[in-house]
Amino acid sequence: MLPRSTLALPPLALAATIVAACGGTGATQSQATSGVGGHGAGSATASVSTSTTGATSSSSSGTGGSGPLMTPIKHVVVIVKENHTFDNYFGSFPGAEGTTACQLKNQTIPCPKAPDSTPRDLCHAHDCALTDWNHGQMNGWEDNASSDMNGDHLAWGQYDESSIPNYWAYAKAFTLGDHFFANVLGSSYPGHMFFLAAQAGWATGNPNLSLLHPYWGCDQSASTVVSVLDKGSCTSKDVFPCFKIPSIPDVLPAGVTWKFYGSNFYVLPEVWSMFNGIDGIRNGPGWANVVKTAELTKDIQNHQLPNVSWLVDQDLADEHPAIGAVCKGENWTVGFINQLMQSEYWKDTVIIFTMDDFGGWYDHVPPPRQYGCDGNTPYGLGFRLPLIIMSPYAKPGFVFKEQSEQASIPRFIERVFNAPALSTLDPAAQDGQANDLMNAFDWNQAPIPPLVLQQRSCP
């Protein structure tokens, strides 16, 4: 996503800015396919740890709860922001597995304080993520040039409670997940796709962009490509980024409604209306449900909140390094959460807050599961991401330590609405094996009241 001020740039400069900010590639297209790239999810299986408290709901594994599930939840709202790891936002959070000591190859340093507005983007493409991961040693960040310039150690920076007090307030009042992993070692495009489809067609990065078609998906020009992992040959190939894969709307039972709030479509630039990358939605009647973020306010006021919602910022409040300041982004999030909590819907709603990818920031916990083709260069899992679960029935003041991943969010939606797993339609989907997040809730507890917070004055 790009600042509106960049729209005044000359065309070549604007193109360079788009590609740099989004981590795009200059690949050329060899073939145009759906990009599924294979039919298996790899031979590895999830290793799910046990919560430190007794279960109060269904099995925590994605495969363990296949029968009808009775909960009071009628609405799920998934809020996706941009580019931060767990350590970056919650490394010093009490009771969570964080660290304030950052590991380099030959030394350990105190993790520096991260600035509200970062001076540059950090490399978070697939190859940079593999470098950072360094075969699970979690000490390769210094080999990426953007991580440290003039000794600022930016990639190891952290925000503490004084930097993001409202996010910390939510984490203290509700449930914070400290073992929630990205499904891909990589960037925004596949990360966003996993929230909708529990897969990304094996895409490893972002599509290239053109000035006339600055969208990530089916509306891009015919020459646009994205690199995907071909699981048949264990090589990369370039395909058109319009994937014929199932997504959550395909499995929701009749009468369960949905919307994606995140489009400023046909307003340059536009990359994170991610249903644009799913052929069956973009070129079907479901595209009418992809709307602007302002429509969420209208739907709450008009008593028309759908059962399943995704909320994604397309502007300067996305918290993406070098684009959106963190304070401004937190205020944006708080504004919408306040609306939901003050509405008639709070009593039966779950709000899930997380990130699309790691953004190039340091995290000290090695991803516990590798899948894809090559164990030395796995597709995922990626690095830990912040996860805050807010609901009257989220366990209060609870750190959810079970291993989970981006595909856990589609799995949670499926469990709440008694929908089949997407993996039953396409084995590439990762929801069938993913933790369903149910042990983050106590359906029998006294409901937690709304936590209405004040937006802050920003630097």
What are these regions (language model features)?
Residues 1, 6, 15-69:
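Ser/Thr-rich, Pro/Gly/Ala-heavy low-complexity intrinsically disordered linkers and tails
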Residues 39, 64-459:
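N-terminal pro-sequences and low-complexity stem/linker regions of secreted or lumenal proteins
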